[in-house]
Amino acid sequence: TTTIKAKKALSVGNELIKKIADNTHSLESNILKNTTIAISCGDAIRGIENPILKTNFKDLFTSLNRNLEIAGSINNKKFIIEAKKTAYNNTLLYDLGEIKDAKFDFYEPLLANSIKLGYANQDYDDLNGRDEFNNTSEFKAPITRVNKLYDLTAPYRADMFGVEFTRINLQGKTTTDNNSDNDVFMLDVEYDFTDADGIENYKLRRPAFTSITGLIDPPSAFNIDLSPKRIFNKHGAWIRGMMWPLTTEKITFQTTDKNPLLKTVQGGVTIQENADVVISDLEPNYFIPITAKFETIVPENLVDIMQSNSTGLFQFTHNGDTYKGWVIACSQKPSTDVEQQWTLLLSADNNINKLIHA
């Protein structure tokens, strides 16, 4: 058994925010407080004394978003990170009334016909490394309107063989002569005990799956809950929104660098890394990838409305039908009553059958 130093994701984030803001802001996050993800580095895994975790907030946020699907906001000198679904609040903020002329169109920045997710592929000097499942996986979507990649890869690693090879092959060496020394690793952990010095100790999480196949040594495996297919599922609501209205179609698995065969069953739920995905099996989508553009007079208290709930919905009526959406863009000239341009992203509960004409 090897003990390595690691930090909680919330602790790393808070340190980075304070450094960026010169101690004027802090990080608040229930999702990071409760996550099982800890952050370590190559030097810590090797057992180097006083290891330094070299990272930045962009890499931290991008990596945590990959695994947790998060969104960030600022409020009263606090940077807040929570689940992305909280940014798609269905609370109605304001009814803009009847709109004379509205233009509806697909919002292409939210469309993609291929999906890449997971972790940078690694080269190992060991044949067993081919069993690694936390690599980059690629999927093909049925969309033909665009030729674009949706990228859910990020810098932090979670490959168990990378952790093990770093620990076993280099443990106790005092020089920083390995490619993984400065790499940042995610570890899926659970609380174990608090020692006499008051330091919390954690152990690697190894969930009790009903069945697990596709690995050489399943009992020793870890970081399974950080796998690419689980990343896919975590972003399921967003991906389903991107694919609208192709709910009966499939997103097909294409390739991965090493092991595509990992399959687990737990609580009646099967997760297979190389399985295709029926879009309708994903979580309900937050949005429809359609924008409504129109001009109307902006309410005088628009700023107050937006500050009260920056993630709420605006509503309008067009040709007798009511629509709701989140603000992508709007402008305000308080000194005039001139109509201003609005752009809303439609929420998933809109009925837009009348708009589908091609």
Regions found by a protein language model. Give the residues of each.
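Short beta-strand-centered aromatic/proline hotspots
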Residues: 320-337
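Autoprocessing Asn-cyclization modules and mimics
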Residues: 265-305
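Acidic, small/polar-enriched beta strand-loop surface segments
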Residues: 3-10, 92-259
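Short beta-strand-centered interaction patches in the first periplasmic/extracellular domains
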Residues: 33-112, 116
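Polar, S/T/G-rich
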Residues: 1-41, 51-62, 117, 127
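Short, solvent-exposed secondary-structure boundary/capping segments
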Residues: 333-349
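Short coil-to-beta transition motif at edge beta-strands of beta-rich domains
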Residues: 297-319
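Secondary-structure transition/turn motif
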Residues: 81-89, 345-354
